[in-house]
Structure formats: C-alpha cells, structure tokens
C-alpha cells in the first residue's frame, strides 16, 4: 500500500513538472475513510465518526477546479479534509471530517 502511494506521489511531482509550463495543474488528492459499499459492510468493526461520503472527494475536486490559483498547488499532495477547512465546504451530512496525519493512523 505504501509503495503504491509513494509511486502516485512521485508520478504527481513528475507530471506537474512536465505540464506546469502548459498551465496544467497536477495534484494528488487523498481522501480519508470513504463510506463505500465495502466499508459499510464492515461498519460494525470500524469507527466511522470521521469518515467521508463518496461525494466529499468530489467537493474537493470542485473546489480545486474553481480555484483560479490552483496552479500554485501543482505537484503537491492534498488531503480532502484539509481542503474542506481551507475552502469552507462540508460533507453531504454537514460534517467536516478532521484531517488526519500519519500519527493519527
């Protein structure tokens, strides 16, 4: 799992370097625990108090897409919950998931 995340982060950085001169921002976007069908089947074993709906990551994408200065983020890794705090959006249930750090996992 960690190797695939590292590869995605590296690909993001490399693509950003190639595409920034063309005005294209490349951003790696990490969701938190998403309430997918699979996650909900295991809900009795999980703490879903800080989970996100599948729509939440879409709101993060929409916020980035509407940001006229998004190019400043190119090559970065962003966490959806942190973007929610910055851009002021919430999940469909009105909650704002707390951004987790590696220490929290």
Spans of features found by a protein language model:
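Short beta-loop-alpha junction of Rossmann-like oxidoreductase domains
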Residues: 24, 30-43
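Catalytic tyrosine of NAD(P)H-dependent dehydrogenase/reductases that use a Tyr as the general acid/base
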Residues: 1
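C-terminal helical subdomain
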Residues: 28, 47-105
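Conserved cofactor-binding/catalytic machinery of classical short-chain dehydrogenase/reductase
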Residues: 7-10, 35, 53-56, 60
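Active-site-adjacent segment of SDR/Rossmann-fold oxidoreductases
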Residues: 14-24, 68-71
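Hydrophobic alpha-helix immediately C-terminal to the catalytic Tyr-X-X-X-Lys motif of short-chain
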Residues: 7, 11-15, 19, 29
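Active-site helix of classical SDR
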Residues: 4
């Amino acid at each position: 799992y960690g190797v695939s995340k590292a590869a995605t982060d590296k690909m993001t950085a490399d693509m950003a370097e190639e595409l920034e001169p063309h005005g294209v921002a490349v951003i790696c976007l990490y969701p938190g625990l998403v309430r997918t069908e699979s996650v909900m089947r295991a809900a009795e074993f999980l703490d879903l108090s800080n989970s996100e709906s599948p729509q939440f990551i879409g709101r993060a994408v929409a916020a980035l897409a509407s940001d006229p200065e998004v190019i400043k983020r190119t090559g970065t890794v962003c966490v959806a919950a942190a973007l929610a705090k910055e851009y002021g959006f919430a999940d469909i249930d009105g909650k704002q998931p707390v951004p987790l750090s590696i220490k929290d996992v």
